[in-house]
Amino acid sequence: MDYKKIDYEKIYEGIIKIDPKIRLVTICDSSGRVMYSQHREGIKNLLTPEESKESLELAVNSWKIRTKLAPKIGKGKYVLAEYEKIKRITMPLGGDDDDHHLLYITTEVQADHSNIIRRVSEITIRKLLL
């Protein structure tokens, strides 16, 4: 798969439409380099830019650790962290076949995270390539 042809904005648009309670969609590569990141219109970031970067780095590093365990426990499908003010979903962009990109999605606490995870998983890279 040629990742240079990925239309990250189109992926964002597809994901943000899934649920109005999605606050933020960030797509990064496996090293944590942000390929695309945008809040839903009208949503205020709760973290400073430095805190946002640190949170993403922690999520990426945690994902790398889980990937090391994959031969024994299987590949990670997603991670859900629920805080008092938001939920954070981290998952591979292209499902089990994509070890190169991570989705980092934040939602309102009331969001139906199971539905969001299921619907995001249904979005395939093939549909989103140029």
Identify the residue ranges that each predicted region occupies:
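Non-catalytic interaction/Regulatory regions outside core domains
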Residues: M1-L130
